[in-house]
Amino acid sequence: MDNTIPGGINITILIPNLMIIIFGLVGLTGNGIVFWLLGFCLHRNAFSVYILNLALADFFFLLGHIIDSILLLLNVFYPITFLLCFYTIMMVLYIAGLSMLSAISTERCLSVLCPIWYHCHRPEHTSTVMCAVIWVLSLLICILNSYFCGFLNTQYKNENGCLALNFFTAAYLMFLFVVLCLSSLALVARLFCGTGQIKLTRLYVTIILSILVFLLCGLPFGIHWFLLFKIKDDFHVFDLGFYLASVVLTAINSCANPIIYFFVGSFRHRLKHQTLKMVLQNALQDTPETAKIMVEMSRSKSEP
């Protein structure tokens, strides 16, 4: 059976790439709005700094995949060097996004398990410093990997260095996955099974939903890229169907976070009285709903 359409494009390639473009455009809009609001319109706190950087990583990650899908559908051919540089940039953004999500989960877990230490001894600019370290480390890992594996300089390839860096990159990703899963489980266990009662806030829901979506949609891309793709000796030999499916899922993951913020922030609120700024502020709210209602009632009573 012929799976091509007029123009010579295989339908098994056309449909996933169209989905990547559609989800990518939705994600670009959502992450762009989140970045604008957190960067220029809202007061930033410890967690909003991470979310701002996560939105930035997702924005450029989606932009790269949209460009790649458009070039593929238009049958634009480009040098292998361009392709390898593109995948290096995508690697930086993927590692940075995963690191941001792991940092968010870990910080939230520490704030719940060690509240006194967290509120009294945590340095003021920890989030900003951590985000800077994450970006630098992600960039350094990927540049070194590309250099020693001959991506940036095809005339130079160090087999031992390439193998060592591939192993380190895979180990670092596994470490991030483990930290993300353990901190999330500890957070959920403390919320629902702990001795002291901790009331659920919108920030908890936002973080838990973002992590759940990543584990379902973002994880397959990392597994394919760093466990299957790196094992193969030939760059061109890999399962195209699984690769495209993992890219579609990771596009869904990158565009899901703004939707989660909108859903959590607007839940039980009348949308006609809510601006996007207020919705995002509600999604990052770290006070129980009952406490917020009491504060609003006290304010309304004090007004003449």
Swiss-Prot record:
Family per similarity comment: Belongs to the G-protein coupled receptor 1 family. Mas subfamily.
Principal location listed in the UniProt entry: membrane
Organism: Mus musculus (Mouse)
Any single Pfam family the record assigns to this protein: 7tm_1
Purpose of the protein: Orphan receptor activated by a subset of RFamide-family neuropeptides such as FLRF-amide and FMRF-amide. Mediates its action by association with G proteins that activate a phosphatidylinositol-calcium second messenger system. Its effect is mediated by G(q) and G(11) proteins. May regulate the function of nociceptive neurons by modulation of pain perception.
Presence of keyword Membrane: yes
Membrane topology: Multi-pass membrane protein
Cytoplasmic topology ranges: 39-53, 97-131, 188-206, 265-304
Superkingdom of origin: Eukaryota
Molecular functions (GO terms): GTP binding; neuropeptide receptor activity; pigment binding
Name under which the protein is recorded: Mas-related G-protein coupled receptor member A1
PANTHER family attached to this UniProt entry: MAS-RELATED G-PROTEIN COUPLED RECEPTOR, MAS-RELATED GPR, MEMBER A2A-RELATED
Extracellular side: 1-17, 75, 153-166, 228-243
Species lineage: Eukaryota, Metazoa, Chordata, Craniata, Vertebrata
